[in-house]
Amino acid sequence: MSLDTVVEDVRDEARARAEDIREAAESEADEIVAEAEADAERIREERLAEVDRQIDQEREQTLSSAKLEAKQERLGARRDVLEDVYDDVEAAIEGLDGDRRRELTETLLDATLAEFDDDEDVAVYTHTEDVDLVEELVEDRNAVVDGEIDCLGGVVAESDTSRVRVNNTFDSILESVWDDELKNISERLFDQ
């Protein structure tokens, strides 16, 4: 065998080895590229899913906020209507006159004085415009009109001996009835 043949064999062997290395490197590079592409696709899908979740979450938050705001608006409007109704009732009570006012005041005075012992001296307070009426109603009773109070009508009475104070004003009756009946009033007004 000649030197040329040996050199040629070594070259062929080197070429074959280089080809094997190149093929192995290409195969490994293809695997790396395929893995990178798969990772990139997985990351892209994860990001898209996260964006979709964020969009859904923001949509739900926006919807919830809008529903809450609408509910608050409805409640505010209902509160305003109820306040208007209360004001109208107050105005109607304040506008009572004549026999109806006398009848209601006398009923409240009777209920108030019933809370005291018969021998107690009772001081009665009433609305400015009702002083004359109440003075007339307390005649021949153990009570005297002792002043005026800021109210729609009715009476407040107290006794020094028993330290009892009874508030039977139109205001207190209205407030009590309003509190007790607010749910029914609301249901009737808003058909719930």
Curated annotation (Swiss-Prot):
One of its GO terms (molecular function) is ATP binding. GO terms for cellular component: plasma membrane; proton-transporting two-sector ATPase complex, catalytic domain. The keyword Disulfide bond does not apply. Keywords: ATP synthesis, Cell membrane, Hydrogen ion transport, Ion transport, Membrane, Transport. The keyword Membrane applies. It is found in: Cell membrane. It is a peripheral membrane protein. InterPro entries: ATPase_E_C, ATPase_V1_Esu. It comes from the Archaea. One of its GO terms (biological process) is proton motive force-driven plasma membrane ATP synthesis. Its main location: membrane. It holds the Pfam family vATP-synt_E. Has multiple subunits with at least A(3), B(3), C, D, E, F, H, I and proteolipid K(x). Component of the A-type ATP synthase that produces ATP from ADP in the presence of a proton gradient across the membrane. Belongs to the V-ATPase E subunit family. This is A-type ATP synthase subunit E. It comes from Halorubrum lacusprofundi (strain ATCC 49239 / DSM 5036 / JCM 8891 / ACAM 34). The lineage of its organism: Archaea, Methanobacteriati, Methanobacteriota, Stenosarchaea group, Halobacteria.
